[in-house]
Amino acid sequence: MSLLRYFIFFIGGCTLALASGVSYTEASVYMSGLSGNENEVPSISPSDSRLVFAHKLGVSRFHKLKSHSGARKIINEMLHSHSELSSFFYAEKSNTFLTIAGLAESELFDTLNPAFRISSCPSSNAFASLMCRYERQLDSLDNGKTTDIYLNDIGGVISIHDSTGVYSQITTTPYKSLEDYEQLFGEDKASMFDISVKQDRVFLSEIYALKILVEFLSSKSQQERSDTSIVIGQLVGLEALYEKYGKDSKIYQVARENMMTLLSMIKQVSSTYTFILLPPIDSSETSTRYHKRQVDMEAFGEEIEEVVASYEKNYNGRCYISEEACSKATNDCSGHGRCSKYGQLDSCYVCQCSNSVVSNAAGQNKTIRWAGESCSKQDISVEFQFFFWFTIIGFGLLIFSIMLLFSIGQEELANVLTSTATVIKKTT
């Protein structure tokens, strides 16, 4: 990831922050397959939300999940709603993860409740820093590469993490963005924007980038092969318009509707999505930039030391030389077990996984078995064995039934049934 991107995040965050200060309202998070109860949407801290997002992106081994964390219940619900068994038989699809600044909860997905809310919502600049941390962790896990396919000069970015694909950047000009916007939403709405104004140009370019992203995700969804790419985006154009023109301005109202339209399109073509809606910043806050910078740095807490099993193992490469090394390398067995000595071997510590019990909407308990070196994978061996042998036995019974019917059909009928002689009744 380039230094230019970090510099743009910093400058963009400063620009928006100086205009409005710090916001402490709640952010709303929408996730595919997970919807909160209308009257009981859970609210968690920014630090707990970091753990949930890390699980969603597959980098939870970098983040320590405490036993009494507010994130644990939500993660268990995610595990219950997305069956590992179904993903075993069906191809994985791309994961879309977007943060949208300047959009409130009630303005999106009327029929869908947020999965959860984030209390004391950090700024968009803090979320941008968090996304960068996730991207570094993704790259270190699979030696993949995160490519910035779109980048503007106030912190907006769209990236794709993929270990195999090569992606070109989305480039446009102010005139091209305005022309494309007019084709999408009409001439009347396009006439409200002035490409000589920086905030207008940024928003139009983000709309153009989202349109290209919709086309990209649509083509991906039609492919039958597995797709493990992850799209991570940070959109700040709407927030910039809010700061420039105000929440009651016509241009902001139109831009908000445009953003909701494109997010709904992404929702339709993306099988797995996460939308983080950051509400418009409250301009009444008077905190200084120095205070805000400190808040941004501490907003999501600290993850564990960024290593991926780089601690020393013993000579056979299967055990860790100490309990501490095992605990650090596996993030305390991903919170699903504990490190203990293996047999009678000296300097050999491995994870002993334990089961988790989650409840579904009907109040029924479900046991989740964990496996793997760091207890980070669900053990579906029992379900697989049941499905496998059920299929084999069922297929065998089907063949046996067909053969039995075929053999019966080849036998000659008895003489009584095949006789054509007419029975004549005698009279006396």
From Swiss-Prot:
One of its GO terms (cellular component) is endoplasmic reticulum. It is a single-pass membrane protein. Keywords: Endoplasmic reticulum, Membrane, Signal, Transmembrane, Transmembrane helix. Residues 1-19 form the signal peptide. Residues 407-428 are cytoplasmic. Residues 20-385 are lumenal. The lineage of its organism: Eukaryota, Fungi, Dikarya, Ascomycota, Taphrinomycotina. It comes from the Eukaryota. The keyword Transmembrane applies. InterPro entries: Archenteron_Induction-Rel, Vps3844_C, Vps3844_N. It holds the Pfam family DUF6859. It is found in: Endoplasmic reticulum membrane. GO terms for biological process: vesicle-mediated transport. This is Uncharacterized endoplasmic reticulum membrane protein C1709.03. The chain crosses the membrane at residues 386-406.
